[in-house]
Amino acid sequence: QNLKVPTFPKNSSEFESAEVRYSSMNLGDNITNNFDGIYDTQYKLDKDGFVTLVIADEIPELREKAEIAGYNFMPWTLPGNKGYLIYRNLLTKGGKTAPYSLNKTPMPNFTTNRSHLISHDAKKYIGAYAPTGLRMTKDEYLSDFGGFNDKFRE
């Protein structure tokens, strides 16, 4: 996952100047179990304010590669191979008009469009602030992050 995150407070004196009060990425399932998560003050940000999050099996060489690259690592702890990645940001400065407001992304209508993933791609509504992901094999990841750096920095 890769996304630009709004600024968040490092302490209570920054509440008024930060773009959001809190943001997090959580890994869960369809019955709302939360298996793991990372929140804003834990993020490793790159020089452009982006967070790159590697979600993979807890294998030392996978974690180490992410850490050496300066990426965040979250172990895949869900049973099976399906899960939900939930991105949250709370109390947005600027409200619904802020470029990073999740309120800009409409709720999907499951009655008329069961596969709402394309029509409701958050990137259409909040641009670089939307999480973007790329699935790859272990070998692809170990060789060059599955081409991740090229695909998301174009």
Where are these regions (language model features)?
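A compositional/structural signature for long, glycine/proline-rich flexible linkers
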Residues: 1-154
